[in-house]
Amino acid sequence: MKLRDESDIPIVGFDIAGSEWGHPADELKQSYDYAHQHFLHKTVHAGEASGPESIFSAVTSCHADRIGHGLQLFREDKIIDPLIDDKKLYISRLANFLADSRITVEVCLTSNLQTMPELKSIKEHSLSKMLDKRLSVSICTDNRLVSNTSVCKELKLMTDNFNLTEKLFKDIVVYGFKRSFFYGSYSDKRKYVGKCISYYESI
């Protein structure tokens, strides 16, 4: 926060990434609370390897504005808390909360194929369910170098494997800008997003 407030470095958000197993996001609740109380955007690596509870922790303990991956959101078999009796209802309510709150899921198709051997085909990815539930989704690379990909490659992979209308494709692209962590005022961000949409519509 000191660096953000006392320098010209455009610090826009706080993130946690790494292995989820044995390292739940809520262990960093104090850090996320601090970021939240100082008006910094927050994203959390959740639901890549661990299940829906990891995403629940990200939004309830860490005030996540965005979720990195979210792949396992709909996996009932990944729920480990014995006190959760109705797993289907738990997932339904969690997905509805994400959709209603417009918490954006950063979907990383190529990376998930590379790191999750249980994902045999991109068509098995939970992206289609996310879209069915009207979640705010953006297409991301996770990393360009290790995964040897780009946003354009990821968008093509999506269009080649999922049945998208032109409107839905545009919505996904636009969500990436609307839900970005922008360095500047909300008014400036609206102007920026407007320019992005105008450019999209011109090509």
Model-flagged regions — what are they?
Residues S111-M116, S138-C140, K156-N161:
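Short beta-alpha connecting loops at secondary-structure transitions
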Residues M1-G13, W21-D65, I79-I103, S121-L135, ...:
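Histidine/acidic residue-rich metal-binding segments in metalloenzymes
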Residues G18-P24, E48-S50, L73-R75, N112-P117, ...:
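Short, small-residue-enriched loops and turns at beta-alpha junctions
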Residues K153, L157, N163-I203:
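Mid-to-C-terminal alpha-helical segments outside catalytic/metal-binding sites
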Residues R66-K78, L145, Y183:
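Glycine-rich phosphate-binding active-site loops on the catalytic face of alpha/beta enzymes
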